[in-house]
Amino acid sequence: MSLEKAQELDTKYPTYKDEFAVPTFKSLGIETSQFNENTDSIYLCGNSLGLMPKSTKQAINDELNAWIERGVESHFNHPGQSEGKTPWVDIDLPLVPLVAPIVGAKENEVAVMGSLTSNLNALLINFYKPKDKRTKILFEKQAFPSDYYAFLNLVKLHGYDESHLVQLKVLPGNTYLTTEQIKKAVDDNIDELAMVCFPGIQYYTGQFFKIEEITNYVKNKGKNEIVVGWDLAHAVGNVPLKLHDWNVDFAAWCSYKYLNSGPGGIAGIYVHEQYTKDNSKTSFSPRLAGWWGNNASDRFKMLEEFDPINSALSYRQSNPSVIDVVAVKSSLELFKKVGGVPKLRKKSIALTQFLQDLLVSSKYYFRSDNDTDRSKIGFTILTPLNQEERGAQLSVLFQPHYDDKQKNIMERVSGYLHNHAIICDERRPDVIRFAPLPLYNTFEETYYAAQRLFEALDKISSEEI
């Protein structure tokens, strides 16, 4: 893999980097004699926090100006309505047709609301209905901690203890779960499972789970008595999804990673239409409810009667933050403009494969399943090497490990990369996650990032750093 090859690929796959604000050497406080201080960084951290679309700043300022000019009246009489702005009372509704294709849902199956864990908790309360022996929740042992906390407290709210959580561990010698392993766990607990909930993409390894296959297996084996949900924090905006076609019951996601909504940005949910099409004042499924999920025509009548909207919007509890909504809208409009996730996925596969090819060609690379001398300086890749089993992320495990941060290989590599304005995500003690995103990363900068990584290991080997 050469620089010329990277440049050739950049002519084949377009970049939309100009649509984004990219941190520079100067803005990051990094001194450089090799580059102009206003040179862009190489930002490979969109799996942690996406870059800001340049249009976001104006979108937010427009709403601040509406607040200045009309105050509360902007809820129903926005000063920018003639220019296409939405009154605040309906501020989130234009996002529904933008989000639905990204997750592969019908418009009546999605809502933009809340934050990831609060949304997940709301869905769990609604969908976890233990009965007789069916009380257990199957999920992964290495789940993002917030998910574990949610599952643990959910079973405790029902009077159960931690034994009602079935946590699936990665088998010795592997770096990620296999679909067959998940199926076996379903079989082993088939009469006791009430719910199965995995991540669409595993945050640490970057593994893309076979959502359709797993969902269908659980439903068929459980005779539709087991609910299947997905945490899509690292999948939404990253890989193509078809939640409705895959018959997923519910899902939740955040938007500040691949959807570029900004830190702590507003999140979203999916609920299959079978659970909301019969909503009525007398037959709705009890949930954590609020006035923003009530029929809009009666919402401001302040009635003591819950009349849920016949869609996933009925799960909304409070009116959303206008600033958060318009921030994510800027990015969603950009996704639509460039052709959506399926089109971006083609470049994403090529870009991540290009990085993988660079890494495995290094003298410092060793296969994770090899009996390698663990005292030798080097790295392996935890992420599945099969491009269909991952998104836009490679998780790189460095060795050897030292408890002293000044000596530890990962810390030293990470520091070297940062000093060269290459922004990645550390996962202590020994992992760096690299996420080349198709929207704003190029093959050329991915090439340079890999070269700086190899330089760092050369200098560590010769004790120069």
UniProtKB/Swiss-Prot annotation:
Tell me which UniProt keywords the record has, alphabetically: Cytoplasm, Hydrolase, Pyridine nucleotide biosynthesis, Pyridoxal phosphate
Which molecular-function annotation in GO is an example for this chain? pyridoxal phosphate binding
Please list the residues that bind pyridoxal 5'-phosphate: L116, T117, F144, P145, S146, D147, D231, H234, Y256, W291, N319
Catalytic activity, EC: 3.7.1.3
Question: Where is it located?
Answer: Cytoplasm
| Location of N6-(pyridoxal phosphate)lysine modifications | K257
Q: Name one GO biological process term.
A: L-tryptophan catabolic process to kynurenine
Describe the reaction catalysed, as an equation.
L-kynurenine + H2O = anthranilate + L-alanine + H(+); 3-hydroxy-L-kynurenine + H2O = 3-hydroxyanthranilate + L-alanine + H(+)
Q: Which Pfam families match?
A: KYNU_C (PF22580)
Signal peptide as annotated in the record: none
Task: Identify the metabolic or biological route this protein is part of.
Answer: Amino-acid degradation; L-kynurenine degradation; L-alanine and anthranilate from L-kynurenine: step 1/1; Cofactor biosynthesis; NAD(+) biosynthesis; quinolinate from L-kynurenine: step 2/3
What InterPro entries does this protein's entry cite?
Kynureninase, PyrdxlP-dep_Trfase, PyrdxlP-dep_Trfase_major, PyrdxlP-dep_Trfase_small
The Swiss-Prot or TrEMBL record lists the needed cofactor(s) as: pyridoxal 5'-phosphate
Q: Which GO terms describe its cellular component?
A: cytoplasm
Instruction: Share what the entry says about its subunit structure, partners included.
Output: Homodimer.
Q: What family is it from?
A: Belongs to the kynureninase family.
The record's function comment reads:
Catalyzes the cleavage of L-kynurenine (L-Kyn) and L-3-hydroxykynurenine (L-3OHKyn) into anthranilic acid (AA) and 3-hydroxyanthranilic acid (3-OHAA), respectively.
HAMAP family to which the protein is assigned, alphabetical? Kynureninase (MF_01970)
What protein does this entry describe? Kynureninase
State the species of origin: Scheffersomyces stipitis (strain ATCC 58785 / CBS 6054 / NBRC 10063 / NRRL Y-11545)
Gene behind this protein: BNA5
